[in-house]
Amino acid sequence: MAKILVLYYSMYGHIRTMADAVAEGSREVSGTTVDIKRVPELMSEEALRKAGAPADDTPVARPEELADYDGIIFGSPTRFGNMAGQMRNFLDQTGGLWAQGKLIGKVGSVFTSTGSQHGGQETTLTSMQTTLMHHGMVIVGVPYSCAALTNMDEITGGTPYGASTLAGPDGSRQPSENELTIARFQGRHVAEITQKLAG
C-alpha cells in the first residue's frame, strides 16, 4: 500500500482545486491511500479577510509528517517566479528530515498556479523541485503521454515539470477542464510510480 500526501498552500482556492484533482488522480490507483493537507498560513486573519481569501479547513501538516509518506505532491502558487513564502517557510523547517535522510528515495512532484500565461510557472516548479532534490527525492513530472499537455485550443497551464493553472491577473479565472485533466494525470502517474518504488 503506497501512501501519498498532497500538500499545498492556496490563498484564493486555485491550488486547492488543483490539489483535489491531483488527489482524485492518485486515488484511481488501486492500493493507494491519499491525504490532502495544507501548510500553515503566515498571514494574519485580518490580512486574509481584507484580501478576500476564503477560509480553508483542510488539516495543517507538520514537517515531521512528511517521512510517513511514500510520495508527496507539493502545490504552491507563484510569487515572483518562486513558490509562496508559506510553502518556502514549511520546507525550510525540514532540515531535521534532511539531516537524517528521511525523504531519500521518496517520490516528489509539484504543481502551481500563476496570474498569467508567462507568470513564472516553470521557474516556480523547478525551484520547488530543487528543494526536493536536496532531500534525495525521486522527481516525477508530467510526461507527454498526457495528451492535454499539447492542447492548442485554449490558453492553458500545464508543463512537463508539473500541472499548472492560470488564475488571471485578478484571480477570477478558475482551473479549466484541460488543466484539471493534467492535474489528475499527474496524481495518477505519481501514484503508479510510487507503487512500483514502495512495493
Curated annotation (Swiss-Prot):
Binding sites annotated in the UniProt record for substrate: 98
GO molecular function: flavin adenine dinucleotide binding; FMN binding; NAD binding; NADH:ubiquinone reductase (non-electrogenic) activity; NADP binding; NADPH dehydrogenase (quinone) activity
Xref: InterPro entries: Flavodoxin/NO_synth (IPR008254), Flavoprotein-like_sf (IPR029039), Flavoprotein_WrbA-like (IPR010089), FMN_Rdtase-like_dom (IPR005025), NQO (IPR037513)
Domain Flavodoxin-like intervals: 4-190
Cofactor: FMN
Organism: Alkalilimnicola ehrlichii (strain ATCC BAA-1101 / DSM 17681 / MLHE-1)
Keyword annotations of the record: Flavoprotein, FMN, NAD, NADP, Nucleotide-binding, Oxidoreductase
Disulphide bonds in the chain: none
Gene3D superfamilies: 3.40.50.360
Residues that coordinate or bind NAD(+): 12
Record-linked HAMAP family: NQOR
Positions annotated to bind FMN: 10-15, 78-80, 113-119, 134
Catalytically driven reaction(s): a quinone + NADH + H(+) = a quinol + NAD(+); a quinone + NADPH + H(+) = a quinol + NADP(+)
Source organism, top-level taxon: Bacteria
Name of the protein in its database record: NAD(P)H dehydrogenase (quinone)
Secretion signal span: none
Keyword Nucleotide-binding found: yes
Family assignment from sequence similarity: Belongs to the WrbA family.
PROSITE patterns in alphabetical order: FLAVODOXIN_LIKE (PS50902)
Enzyme class: oxidoreductase
Any one Gene Ontology cellular component term annotated for this protein: membrane
